[in-house]
Amino acid sequence: MKRRHLPPVLVLLLLSILSLSFRRRLLVLQGPPSSSSSSRHPVGDPLLRRLAADDGAGSSQILAEAAALFANASISTFPSLGNHHRLLYLRMPYAFSPRAPPRPKTVARLRVPVDALPPDGKLLASFRASLGSFLAARRRRGRGGNVAGVMRDLAGVLGRRYRTCAVVGNSGVLLGSGRGPQIDAHDLVIRLNNARVAGFAADVGVKTSLSFVNSNILHICAARNAITRAACGCHPYGGEVPMAMYVCQPAHLLDALICNATATPSSPFPLLVTDARLDALCARIAKYYSLRRFVSATGEPAANWTRRHDERYFHYSSGMQAVVMALGVCDEVSLFGFGKSPGAKHHYHTNQKKELDLHDYEAEYDFYGDLQARPAAVPFLDDAHGFTVPPVRLHR
């Protein structure tokens, strides 16, 4: 007896019905996708996020410098002529030619008070301990983890939260603004890189709660004033005003030690070195917005960004990191002196007009605009679980 076979068309129809039935049963078992799972998708362009999260050559260079100082640096001090002060030398071995043996090369030179510092060996041990902490923090960061988690810890660094905060940039747009009283009315006022307020009070105010600087500012203070002024004279807003500093060059950690050693009760030099996680978070946000702006302006692939910016030196500005810190400690944040206008000086307190090439200010302005209008669109801050961007107002 011959078997009866179904026509091919009927076989395909039967398979389609069975497949549809199975898919419906699977959907019933799984349920619809939850809004909570979809909300966990990272904010921003995935490719730009991945590229921005790469620390790049600049971070590797700083780590290499710190490791070299930790392993090979030497410190020696000598009395000056007349023994009025001491000359301090930070040196590293350096081969001046491929065949020549390494010889000591001076990395930093400071004039310091005769009796304010510990012996050379103890000072070197303290410097190596500071370098060791610096390296350990960045290596922990490099092994992964959520750098945005620092946003939950920032209030503890300053000891409390603040209701209203003003971050005062140094742009020349402040001149003639009359914003001084409005700035001083905030609970916390953050100023940048020890910018002068004397003579500009009507436009920039006089109140300062925190001075935020890059370590180049501290290095300049130490080189000029370590011998003559307590705490290197690096607190123009008063000896009690704390300073938050991010490290541009690991050798500058020695300046911090020197200035701490010359502190007095009236100038106690309260210095906070920024958390490595905060440094990484700011670097990623700055690079993301710079990448996005590059792609939008040029139409080129994001991979070509390095043709416009040298990764070894590209860096966020002091102002941007101060803004991110304020987001973590303040219920409301106001930004003054960020931006530019035709004819305005780069800094209100200097004659500088040209911007520094290592910063992408336009990209940072895009970031501030998103903080004010679209805070949920800011990448990487969404990784800070339990953190909400506070209201931000950018005063033009």
Curated annotation (Swiss-Prot):
Residues 1-6 are cytoplasmic. It is an enzyme of class 2 (transferase). Residues 24-396 are lumenal. Glycans are attached at residues 72, 260, 304. One of its GO terms (molecular function) is sialyltransferase activity. CDD domains: GT29. Coiled coil: none annotated. Disulfide bonds: none annotated. Its EC number is 2.4.-.-. GO terms for cellular component: Golgi membrane. The chain crosses the membrane at residues 7-23. It is a single-pass type II membrane protein. It holds the Pfam family Glyco_transf_29. The keyword Glycoprotein applies. Does not possess sialyltransferase-like activity in vitro. This is Sialyltransferase-like protein 2. The lineage of its organism: Eukaryota, Viridiplantae, Streptophyta, Embryophyta, Tracheophyta. The gene is STLP2.
